[in-house]
Amino acid sequence: MKEIAVFGLGTLGKSLAISYSNMGGKVIAIDKSQEKVDEISDYVTFAIRADLTEENVIKGLGVSNVDVALFSFFTLFIR
């Protein structure tokens, strides 16, 4: 199976990460909330806390070799 990275562990991201992992896939799950990372860590290959709104964070996560990257988060930018 392909290795996926799921960025954002809200309702959709968490469900996708756990479902794919239960099918035998390798999953890297990433969220800025340590609580969400802790909740999913037993179900996925790796769970990482990172703030994806910071520049260059994705490059430093070591996910450049995954087969699929899913971005499932919402950030409202107000000026």
Regions found by a protein language model. Give the residues of each.
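Cytosolic regulatory regions of ion transport systems
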Residues: M1-R79
